[in-house]
Amino acid sequence: MYYPGLVSISFRDHTPAKIALAAYKYGLKHIEWGSDIHAPCADSKQLQFIAGLHSTFDISCCSYGTYFRLGHSPISELLQYIEAAKILGTNILRLWAGRKKAADCTKEERDFLFSECRKAAAIAEEHNVILCLECHRRTYTETKDGALELMQEINSPNFRMYWQPNPDISPEENLNYITSLDPYITHIHVFNWSADQRYSLQEGVDVWKEYLSAMSGNHHLLLEFMPDDRIQSLPGEAEALLELIQR
């Protein structure tokens, strides 16, 4: 089963209230709030305000999109993000794995990153949250081999993956990534880009249908960014997402 939602950083220039209203209006019942602008982990008043929006608009926070970067951010700061996530009403946090893809890491960099990941996973298990790594270029999880190695090494139910297409590789290669990482994937960031161009999701429905057919289990499908970054484009993108889910 798929649950439609929105990543708040799609609209960094808009307020949480406006984003929550738009999500509700266009049938996106779940929001991933970003920690950089909308929901800073140290601002408990703002976090509580956002939690109130969930009741007002009958939506939920499906995840906390942090910019905590394993291997770079002090592991001692992770607890503050976990506390913030719980205020927002979610037990899922998005993290980043380093600043290099696996093939570019030295043994020392790899060993340190994995050590920090093990510490983070232990903290997640203790606090009953799930840490999910962004599937992103210029991080350890850029390639399926790097991501799979990391998942297998850490081997924790509280340490998992997001997935999103890599616009630098082919749809077939993206499908291979999904197939390899499927047991570890939680949420999906949804957009339709090439390496140098953004397109509407409607233009990519067919390839996205293939991506979803390769996945098992339940997933939140979260729109991330608009083709033109305008909130006015949300109705069309939301319509395409809902169409994709209903296929």
Predicted regions and their residues:
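Active-site-proximal loop/turn and secondary-structure-junction residues that shape catalytic pockets
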Residues: 10-12, 35-37, 67-70, 97-101, ...
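N-terminal pre-domain/capping segments
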Residues: 1-91, 156, 195, 227, ...
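Distinct, well-ordered alpha-helical segments
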Residues: 15-20, 43-47, 51, 73-76, ...
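Active-site cleft segment of glycoside hydrolase catalytic domains centered on the general acid/base Glu
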Residues: 103-117
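Active-site groove signature of glycoside hydrolases
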Residues: 90-105, 127, 132-136
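Acidic/histidine-rich catalytic cores of soluble enzymes
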Residues: 3-4, 30, 64, 119-208
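Short acidic/histidine-rich active-site segments
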Residues: 220-226
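A short helix->loop->beta-strand "cap" motif at the edges of active sites that frequently abuts
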Residues: 59, 90-91, 129, 217-220
